[in-house]
Amino acid sequence: MDNLDVICIGAAIVDIPLQPVSKNIFDVDSYPLERIAMTTGGDAINEATIISRLGHRTALMSRIGKDAAGQFILDHCRKENIDIQSLKQDVSIDTSINVGLVTEDGERTFVTNRNGSLWKLNIDDVDFARFSQAKLLSLASIFNSPLLDGKALTEIFTQAKARQMIICADMIKPRLNETLDDICEALSYVDYLFPNFAEAKLLTGKETLDEIADCFLACGVKTVVIKTGKDGCFIKRGDMTMKVPAVAGITAIDTIGAGDNFASGFIAALLEGKNLRECARFANATAAISVLSVGATTGVKNRKLVEQLLEEYEG
């Protein structure tokens, strides 16, 4: 694709969700489940998949191994019409695989490969020449790939802004004890930041949504969108604040990828020129559908599902 809407940079891995499991899984010799299956996972491929299904042209920039798991990812991208021109395959590494242990109430713990592709992704895997082809850059999760540190992120975002791209970013909890100071310069280029409340509280050391948002705004983030789970989201831009409630009546089966789905919905709405509240409502609806199925990209099969839920949603 020569003309793109979004470039997603970040992890592309394979998830093996095991559900439902209980806390006593290690107290028995055998733990039968109804079904065990592989799905694609990782923040960037999750976003690329959902944004593509929502109707926008999307490219994935990541690094995978030249192995069975990597081929699984390539096949998925082709099926979902995701541009993989800048998805690098490296014969010297293993594609990261995450085994997700998911409880009955949707909470999860990951068992991960510390030496997999997720940990090898670095700035050399970013194809800057393609930035001019897209409108928006999504750095799918700050801290997820440790080699994409504050310095690397600053370079990526500088290159994106030189091409007038909108920059969105999500984050996870720091893996290597990174601090807000480590990424503050990079954040000064970010137009929309999508942390969840627990991650943002940990990183900033603040307790309230307002205080947390102010820390990110002080770094130069233009709009802070804090995901608050069952409460929806909190938005702050300058002196303007807004709370947008979640979709009511949703019972989560699996929360894996819910944040990625939220970001995807928000990004899709941004590209369509929707205002902040409309973007948040669309994001909340996208996330709500995602948690009703096992797997990060299983629930949101098409745009129609989101639009149908929006008709019932009073956010």
Swiss-Prot record:
GO biological process, one term: D-glucuronate catabolic process
InterPro entries: Carboh/pur_kinase_PfkB_CS (IPR002173), PfkB_dom (IPR011611), Ribo/fructo_kinase (IPR002139), Ribokinase-like (IPR029056)
Keywords annotated in UniProt: Kinase, Transferase
GO cellular component, one term: cytosol
GO molecular function: 2-dehydro-3-deoxygluconokinase activity; carbohydrate kinase activity; protein homodimerization activity
The organism's place on the tree of life at top rank: Bacteria
Transmembrane segments: none
Enzyme Commission designation: 2.7.1.-
UniProt xrefs under Gene3D superfamilies: 3.40.1190.20
Sequence similarity: Belongs to the carbohydrate kinase PfkB family.
Protein name listed in UniProt: Uncharacterized sugar kinase YdjH
Gene from which this protein is expressed: ydjH
